[in-house]
Every structure is written in C-alpha cells, then in structure tokens.
Amino acid sequence: MGGGYTKTLYKKILSKKYIHSTRDEHKKHLLESIDLKAINTGCPTMWKLTPEHCAKIPTKKAKAVILTLTDSSVNLKLDQQLINLLINNYSEVYFWPQGLRDMEYFSSMQNIECVHVVSPDIFSYDRLLNSVDSIDYIRTRLHAGIFAMQHKKRTFILTVDNRASDISKTYNINVFERSNMYGLREAIESDFQTKVEINLDNIIAWKQQFLIKEN
C-alpha cells in the first residue's frame, strides 16, 4: 500500500462507517490492514459477467481478433511474436490503440501491413465489437478485455502487472503469462468455456448497506 503517509491518507479520506468494495483479495487485505472494513466484490465492470452471460460467449476460435498493446510496458520481442502469432492464426487482425503512445509503439513493429487499425476511441471499439460477430480479444489491456466479454467475445488477457493476475485468482478470467506464447497458441486453437466466477452474494451485501432502513 505504500509508506506511512499513504496509509494515513487512506485512513483519513476513506469511510470508517461503510464497507469498501475492492476488486480483488489483495486490495481487501490492504484495507483491512489499516482497520478499514472491506469486501471483495470484484471490479464493477465485471458484475454483469454472470453464468448466464458467460454461457453466451463462444467457445471456439473466431475468424478475426482484436489486438491491443501497452505503451507503458514495452517488450518488442514478445509483442512481435504475438503479432506474428495472430496473423498466422486469424483471417483478420484489428489493432485498437488505447494509450497515448500505443500507435507509435505499434508502428515500430514489423509485418503489420495487413493489420486493420481502429480509431483510438471507445465508440470505434464498441462499434467493432458489435459489427463483427466472429471476433476474439487478445492482449494486455485488462478493461478492454472485460469490455469485450461484456459484448460476448472470447477473451485472452496477457499479464503485464499484478492487476489481471490478482483478479484472475479469485474470478477465473482467462489470463496468460505474457511470455507464454506456446500456451496462448494452444488456448487459441482449443475449445473452452468462459466461466467468470462473480460473487453475487458479496455484491448484494455491499449494496445493502446503502439502503434506507425503515423504522
């Protein structure tokens, strides 16, 4: 959580009365370590990924794929391997630049002439997900991957920090080590079901504290 100043700041600005919602167990334990009440509800962006919703996500490889890159976590070798892997395994590859320098980083890669670049805004990304029926999402942007699952798209998220791995430990999202290209290749070709394990009881418990109780 950081040093003494950070802990003091959190204890000052966060409520001692209410239970705080956290996205994973690690964040829950951090808040509890400074005597604040917390419950692990998962990220609110995941709350609609119920068993009924996930059952509608395709299990087989799509014809097309959306790729994102992370300009803040550059690895030319691994990212070039990923681009080559996707070009060899999908009929169409789309690149959606989300960060400020994502496009600049992507342009430094080789073998990208056949990749379709999507405008760097959420509306274009949403339009692509809605207009292409058979499309997977693969890459490092966690919330772009969750957004794809909200649109019922098969999703593979590659880790570049602890956020995706921490959430995956509790909620079973499809996360792979960035360097595990062999495992990713096998997963792309395999049939699997998306089974995000949302804790609806925790979500309901957190929401109920805000209900006005009648005397």
Model-derived features: positions:
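Active-site anion-handling motifs in enzyme catalytic cores
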Residues: M1-N215
